[in-house]
Amino acid sequence: MAKKGKKYVEAAKLIERTKAYDVAEAVSLTKKANTAKFDATVEVAFRLGVDPRKNDQQIRGAVVLPNGTGKTQRVLVFAKGEKAKEAEAAGADYVGDSDYITKIQQGWFEFDVIVATPDMMGEVGKIGRVLGPKGLMPNPKTGTVTFEVEKAINEIKAGKVEYRVDKAGNIHAPIGKVSFEDEKLVENFATIYDTILKAKPAAAKGVYVKNVSVTSTMGPGVKVDPSSFSAK
C-alpha cells in the first residue's frame, strides 16, 4: 500500500473515519481537506447493492448537473452533411467522419467526449477497441449516439456527466471543483444522487445504496449520511 504524504495525513485528521456526515458538512470538509495546489475536482462515490455481472443489474446513463462540473469539455462529433453543419453551429470542437477515425488510429486523443449520429456508428465501430477501454465509445444510453446533435452538444457543454457501475458495484462521478460554492456542490450532489436512485434495477435486492462518500482529487474521502439529503 502506498504511503500517504504528510499533507494528506494532516488533512485526514479533520475527518472522523467512522462518522457519516450531513451532506453540507461533508462538502465543506472535503474542500478543507483538499491538499492539491490546483482547482481539484470534487467527486461522489456510491457503493451499490447490485451484481454488475448480471445484465439486468447494469447501471449506465448521464445527467446534466445544474451547476456544471467546472471543466470545459472538448467535443468530437462524427456526422455528415447537414448534421455536421449543425454540430459546427452548436459549438463542437471537432467535426468530421473518416478523417478523425484515421487520426484516432494514429494516437490522437485531444477530446473528452464523442457524439456520433447513428449512421456513423459503423465507422466509429472500427475504433471501438481503442475507444472502449478509455470510456470514450459513444452510447445511446448516455445520449451520445443521436441525430439530435445540437441538443447533445449543448448538454455536454452545460455540464453533463456520464456514470456507469464498475465491476465492484461502484459508481464515481464528478460534481464540481473545490472552488465551487458549497451550495452549488450540494445541488449537484443531490441531482446525481436522485438520478442514481431512479436508476435502481428492478432485479436489485436488499440495500441499494450501501455507502456514499465525497472526495477531492488528492484528498481523503468523507462519508455521507443518506438521510441528510434523501428528502431534498
From Swiss-Prot:
Binds directly to 23S rRNA. The L1 stalk is quite mobile in the ribosome, and is involved in E site tRNA release. CDD domains: Ribosomal_L1 (cd00403). One of its GO terms (biological process) is translation. Signal peptide: none annotated. The lineage of its organism: Bacteria, Bacillati, Bacillota, Bacilli, Bacillales. GO terms for cellular component: large ribosomal subunit. Part of the 50S ribosomal subunit. InterPro entries: Ribosom_uL1_bac-type, Ribosomal_uL1, Ribosomal_uL1-like, Ribosomal_uL1/biogenesis, Ribosomal_uL1_3-a/b-sand, Ribosomal_uL1_CS. This is Large ribosomal subunit protein uL1.
